[in-house]
Regions:
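Hydrophobic transmembrane alpha-helices that form the core helical bundles
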Residues: 49-69, 83-104, 110-140, 201, ...
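Membrane-interface loop-to-helix entry segments
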Residues: 106-122, 162-186, 257, 346-348
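Helix-loop-helix connectors at the membrane interface of multi-pass transporters/channels
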Residues: 113-116, 127-148, 239-262, 304-329
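Hydrophobic alpha-helical segments and their helix-loop junctions in multi-pass secondary transporters
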Residues: 12-22, 51, 123-140, 146-147, ...
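N-terminal alpha-helical transmembrane segments of multi-pass membrane transport
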Residues: 1-69
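Transmembrane alpha-helical segments of multi-pass small-molecule transport proteins
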Residues: 5-14, 83-91, 112-125, 139-164, ...
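Membrane-water interface regions at transmembrane-helix termini and the short interhelical loops
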Residues: 1, 16-32, 73-75, 94-109, ...
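Loop-to-transmembrane helix boundary motifs in multi-pass membrane proteins
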Residues: 146-152, 223-231, 250-282, 286-291, ...
Length: 348
């Protein structure tokens, strides 16, 4: 499987390069064109999930203690799992769904259509499940009723927000600014100054020096990430392609590789400063991380709910607002509980 994944990853990235070179001046225009900044905000908040907030600290511990990762530092590894190269996946799928799919209509073939929708629904629920699993790491001694109640509330808000397209812009832009605020707050609280932040960020340079290592699974955990990026890029590519507003192919690729990677690099560098210096994250900032994580989960679930409900005709216009929200909430919560309490488990 690792060989197949390596070949697939290389093929996707090579395709991205070919598109950016040979079809570099093809303009990508979606159904609902938005400004560049709004497009990037929607991409950033829908294309990522709660893992961006909750995974880095536990991941740093893993990378620092396992021999398989000894070729570089934990910050470079975490950036390699989330930044730069992997965004080429999104470029390929956004270009496909914006330019190619309207002509080929492969995703309207019944088998492909229903397989696609099943994967979207399962992944949507798994995102909520990951939030459930990682909550105790950030809210110490959280009770089970509160934990499940919070996840159920998040799913309910996501279902409600997916009823109208205007909420996409509000959620995306708002959560982007909240994320920037979280970065600033934790930077300020850590008393690292610009020098400490810059020193921490220097570790990311090792990612580019060892970039060849990320073209194949390093470990089973890295393999999980790559599978996740592949699945996520196909789903989010369908959604995000609706909001592109006339970017040429080469501009789109450049924007995807660079723009999201900047805040990701700064965020990870702030967290790595805490980790590398043995600093505890204060309770108030852990709560803030959960708060921003909640918004990211809502964004992710919102975008995926919009996608599968549109694909299968389970729309607000057809069902009515109340039945639409209730149906989506019931589907998601049932699957989250299925992941939690039955042998239906995903290992990562």
């Amino acid at each position: 499987m690792a060989l197949i994944l390596t070949i697939a990853m290389s093929a996707v990235l090579l395709t991205a390069f070919i598109i950016a070179v040979y079809w570099r001046n093809v303009e990508c225009v979606g159904e609902i064109p938005t400004s560049f900044l709004t497009f990037m905000a929607i991409l950033f908040t829908s294309g990522l999930d709660v893992g961006l907030i909750m995974f880095p600290i536990p991941d740093f511990n893993i990378y620092a203690n396992e021999a398989s990762y000894a070729f570089t530092n934990p910050l470079a590894l975490e950036f390699g799992f989330w930044g730069f190269l992997v965004w080429g996946f999104y470029f390929t799928t956004i270009f496909y769904f914006c330019i190619v799919e309207p002509k080929l209509k492969l995703f309207e073939i019944p088998l492909i259509k229903w397989t696609n929708n099943i994967v979207i629904i399962g992944t949507c629920a798994f995102s909520a499940y990951l939030f459930l699993v990682y909550l105790p790491d950030f809210i110490v001694a959280i009770s089970d009723p509160l934990k499940y109640g919070l996840v159920g509330t998040v799913v309910l808000i996501a279902a409600a927000s997916s009823t109208h397209i205007r909420y996409v812009k509000i959620l995306s832009i708002g959560s982007t600014w909240l994320f920037f605020g979280l970065i600033f707050g934790m930077w300020w609280s850590g008393d690292m100054g610009l020098g400490g932040l810059a020193s921490s960020m220097m570790n990311i340079g090792d990612y580019f020096y060892n970039i060849n290592h990320y073209l194949a699974p390093i470990t089973d955990y890295h393999q999980f990430y790559l599978y996740w990026w592949f699945a996520w890029s196909i789903m989010i590519g369908q959604f995000i392609s609706r909001f592109v507003s006339g970017l040429k192919a080469w501009q789109l690729l450049g924007a995807l590789l660079v723009v999201p990677s900047i805040p990701i690099a700064i965020w990870f560098s702030v967290l790595y400063f805490y980790f590398d210096n043995g600093m505890d994250i204060a309770s108030i900032w852990r709560i803030a991380m959960v708060g921003v994580g909640v918004i990211f989960v809502i964004n992710s679930l919102d975008s995926l709910m919009r996608l599968y409900t549109r694909n299968i005709g389970m729309t607000v216009e057809r069902l009515g607002r109340l039945k639409y929200v209730a149906s989506n909430w019931l589907i998601m919560v049932s699957l989250v509980l299925l992941y939690q309490f039955t042998p239906l488990q995903i290992e990562w």
